[in-house]
Structure formats: structure tokens, C-alpha cells
């Protein structure tokens, strides 16, 4: 059900795998939790996890110094993967990542200290159904999005039901990507929404 997930990439001997760490513990082998699958994540994330790590393991440009990965998925299956490295990313990495993105049908961003390489786009489009209407959202890498899209649809439906008999104007502070703003706008004369996060 989680539409996003973040993992460390753990290198041990010749093997590489997804990892998390015990809550409140220092990131180390003693607190390591291997995550070949992550049942709390969306089906599309779980389907991609083994394919991504197996493909990256075959290519030294993708494998070497790969430190962490962030997955962001949409209900449609569209996927944005951010691969985070402890090395400078060059043209060889970019070529390898472009091939990987084509093979897996995903969007990839490469990150390293002071670097962000966007291969195609740095967002996905999510479509949420609220009381029979579809709302399209651009969800940008690094910005906040509701982690559970189906629960989000129910939250938006509840908010619209409550707002149905209201009138006047709506002021929304910290609106993010307009998650509540768009569906609620149907119930008000004018809407003013603000956000401090530039990525949202």
C-alpha cells in the first residue's frame, strides 16, 4: 500500500542487497535488516525491487558505490527511482542508467554530493479518484506525498463531504502539491493556497 519506500544498499562480499536498520539503532551490520521484498510497499515497488538490484549488480557503473535508493510509484505503475551514490556520476554512469531505465520502463535520477542527473523527468503523475472525479497530481522527487494513495482518496472524499455544505472562500496553508486543494476547490468560491517547500 505504500507508494514510496527508501532503502540503503548494503554491499557485503560480492553481494548487494536492500537494507533497513532497527529503529533507534546506529546504521551498522548489528542493526541491519535485509529487505529482499517490502510487503508494506505497493505491488509495483515489490515487483521492481529484484529486477533493479539484479540488473545493477551486473554493471559496475551502476553497482560501485551505490549507497541508497528511493522508490516513488503511482497507482498506474509509473515509477521514479532515485539512485544515490558515494561517487561522482559521469557519462558512463548516465549511459548505463539510461539503458536500465529503458529495460525496466522506469524514470531514473542519479544523485551524489552536489550532483543530480535527471534522465527523463523528476516526477510521476498520480491520478486519484474522489467521489467519482479524477484528479491528476504531479508528484516531484523529494517532495512530500501521501504514502498510501487509496487511504488518501478516502481522506479527500471525507474532506469534500464535510465541505459540501460550506460556502465562501478557502485558505489553505502548507498545501504541498495541492493534494487537498484541488478536490476542495469545487466547494468554494475562491481558493488561496500557500506552500514554503519549493519542490512541492
Region spans (language model):
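Accessory RNA-recognition modules of RNA-modification enzymes
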Residues: 1-200
Amino acid at each position: 500500500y505504500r507508494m514510496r519506500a527508501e532503502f540503503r544498499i548494503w554491499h557485503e562480499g560480492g553481494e548487494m542487497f536492500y537494507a533497513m536498520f532497527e529503529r533507534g539503532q546506529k546504521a551498522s551490520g548489528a542493526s541491519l535488516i535485509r529487505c529482499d521484498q517490502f510487503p508494506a510497499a505497493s505491488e509495483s515497488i515489490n515487483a521492481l525491487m529484484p529486477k533493479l538490484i539484479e540488473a545493477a549488480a551486473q554493471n559496475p557503473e551502476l553497482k560501485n558505490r551505490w549507497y541508497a535508493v528511493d522508490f516513488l510509484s503511482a497507482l498506474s505503475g509509473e515509477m521514479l527511482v532515485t539512485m544515490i551514490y558515494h561517487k561522482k556520476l559521469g557519462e558512463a554512469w548516465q549511459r548505463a542508467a539510461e539503458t536500465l531505465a529503458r529495460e525496466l520502463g522506469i524514470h531514473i535520477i542519479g544523485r551524489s554530493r552536489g550532483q543530480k542527473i535527471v534522465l527523463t523527468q523528476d516526477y510521476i503523475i498520480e491520478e486519484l479518484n474522489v467521489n467519482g472525479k479524477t484528479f491528476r497530481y504531479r508528484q516531484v522527487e523529494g517532495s512530500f506525498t501521501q504514502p498510501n494513495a487509496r487511504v488518501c482518496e478516502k481522506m479527500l472524499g471525507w474532506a469534500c463531504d464535510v465541505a459540501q455544505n460550506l460556502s465562501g472562500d478557502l485558505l489553505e496553508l502548507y498545501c504541498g502539491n495541492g493534494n487537498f486543494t484541488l478536490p476542495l476547490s469545487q466547494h468554494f468560491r475562491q481558493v488561496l493556497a500557500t506552500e514554503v517547500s519549493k519542490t512541492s
